[in-house]
């Protein structure tokens, strides 16, 4: 199991890395075309609303509820029941999504008024956002069904297809920048059209792979009388688990919506600065955090179904050690290289040096909470695998309250940076609550060696950070440099930083290869 877990994590991380690279190219194209203008703010709000719902309704809450229930059916081995469950699930989930999509398109003016009330004072920006939202909202319908397909693949430990599917969104938006923006009257509408097309393409892409898995079923709203009770019971259980999970998995996204709402009252560009800095913070979060969470949820669900309580705890411990080993130095690197990263990736065309300065400040604030964002992704499945979606909800409610209070306190003094900082603090609170919740219940028992590992990784990260800081220079030097010089300089810093970090770890006695398998955790310092 442990070798399969490691292999699956590497596969998902590799595919996600490719997806994030294409995402960076996409954002470079967006920065060059719209920068942090009114058009950019309008598109980012129009895209954030369905994307927010997709993350909590499609990928987050649905996966948290669907995977444990479906994994149990898979383990039972009844093929007829499995297909009947999928057919009923697809039919009812699809109807709910269709209804929400229609409501969203009709209620677009109200949604923009709620999410970005600051736009009401600028009628052109408000109307443009509404028009763009009516094109982007159907993306929710398509991509939530894609999330169901991903749940099927992940439950069978087939992670490659769902991990690479997001690339299609990036390619669609790049195509929109290249071919639609030049011929359409408004860039925001052109980009919104690209989002709509991306949703349909992503769903179509999944179909042949579902057929190969013998999981491509015709959606149904009812099942035969003989299957009715057990199948409907399982489908209803998914929706029951999903209701509290809707809130529990969405706290980070709700916090970002609060940021968008408050940022809409700030100077033009604030929404965009938060978007660009969030995108950079999401790179390590997606490549490692979400990839790891994707892999361990079905693993934990099967271990729970097999009542493997010891292995359940060991799997969580294995994941947390890798979070510390990879994410802590990534967080330090993001803080030290915020300016160079933003300059190299985005500072072209409409994206100005001022935008670099403002976005780098919020990136540092987001990076402070990066390890907490990843820990949440890893620990929440510890509850979801046990079909407990209510406990994470309570913790998420507390964290969201912390974010709301801090956002209101900090936004007037620190503007968009205060909003990013509030989000990071809320994530730290949420991660701490999840950790102690699992620990108090005896679900997770840390294995020996944690304090030693924490100290050694912190020292190695600090040494790496000092080397990067001394080699990075000031942001002005990066702004004045050519693209090739920026790329070469940044690549050199990344290679040197990785080398210094690895040498520091080895000098301190940390041997990462001893953490590769679940059975080997706790031996890395031997």
Model-found features: residue ranges?
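Membrane-embedded alpha-helical bundles of multi-pass transporters/translocases
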Residues: 1-526
